Regions:
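Short beta-strand-to-loop acidic/aromatic patch adjacent to the donor-nucleotide binding site
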Residues: 84-95
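Short, well-formed alpha-helical segments that are part of the catalytic scaffolds
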Residues: 15-29
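Hydrophobic helical membrane-anchoring modules
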Residues: 1-4, 151, 175-250
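Acceptor/aglycone-binding surface of glycosyltransferases and processive sugar-polymer synthases
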Residues: 62-81, 98-181, 208-217, 224-227
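Donor nucleotide-sugar binding loop of glycosyltransferases
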Residues: 16-19, 43, 97
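Conserved short acidic donor-positioning loop in nucleotide-sugar-dependent glycosyltransferases
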Residues: 27, 41-42, 66, 75
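A conserved acidic beta->alpha catalytic loop
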Residues: 40-49
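Short hydrophobic beta-strand elements that form part
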Residues: 8-12, 37, 61
Length: 250
């Protein structure tokens, strides 16, 4: 709980057996989280079994793998159903430190922002944290291009550490988004489309053996999807196209 607002952490999980408990323990150690929602996207390991042993959790298991974006759709749906006022996504692979949860929750709970990102780029230590060089370069290039198309000034669009207000999540047309990794990018573009300011806090970078990552071919597909999303945003702003991602909001 923060300022009488219910704080819910959502964890989109896939084969996270080795790191789930460690991540969960650190999340709860922050003393502001009321509930953790874990959605297992048909893992091949014991992620679901580990999750069900954790207190103060709601566990949902997809019977078949539906994709990272679809996992998040379930996460946010459940969070809203549970009465969440502040929703924070933390990956259960321990790549993002849960120690930033109080800061992110305070920025939402005090009404300063409706969306806060944990940026690995702001601190300038992404490479020192073992982010692969090709990922760093692609992150910087994509972010530069996306800022041009959207008019924003974010340091990165590609972090999986995010906090949202209930008010914001209820406005987003998330069902129109991809079920794959580009969901993340589409979501941020939709937030900007609505006219919200996105805040950022510096987040340490941690890449290690157990941290989840996508291969080069899927990274390429994701990158192209990000550019297409940003282009659609600009064309829709110019009223040259209509897009289900960016409908006319009244």
């Amino acid at each position: 709980m923060f300022a009488n607002k219910k704080v819910v952490v959502v964890m989109p999980a896939y084969n996270a057996q080795k790191t789930l408990r460690q991540t969960y323990d650190e999340v709860m150690a922050q003393n502001v989280v009321d509930l953790v929602i874990i959605v297992d996207d048909a893992s091949h390991d014991d992620t679901a079994a580990v999750a069900r042993k954790l207190p103060h959790t709601v566990v949902e298991v997809h019977p078949e793998n539906r994709g990272y974006g679809a996992n998040q759709k379930t996460c946010y749906k459940l969070a809203l159903e549970q009465g969440a006022d502040i929703i924070i996504m933390v990956h259960p692979d321990y790549q993002y430190t849960p120690k930033l949860i109080p800061a992110m929750a305070s920025m939402i709970g005090n009404g300063l922002y409706h969306c806060v990102l944990g940026s690995r780029i702001l601190g300038g230590c992404a490479l020192a944290g073992n982010m692969p060089f090709y990922k760093y370069i692609s992150n910087r290039f994509l972010t530069f291009a996306e800022n041009i198309f959207t008019g924003a000034k974010l340091s990165e669009y590609h972090t999986g550490y995010r906090a949202f207000s209930r008010q914001l999540l209820e406005q987003l047309p998330l069902d129109a988004n991809s079920d794959d990794f580009v969901f993340d990018n589409q979501m941020l573009a939709q937030i900007l489309w609505l006219g919200y300011t996105i805040a950022e806090v510096s987040c340490p970078t941690k890449y290690f053996a157990e941290a989840s990552s996508i291969n080069f071919s899927r990274s390429l597909k994701y990158g192209l999807g990000c550019l297409w999303t940003a282009l659609q945003f600009r064309l829709a702003k110019m009223k040259l196209i209509k897009s289900k991602l960016f409908p006319s909001f009244s």
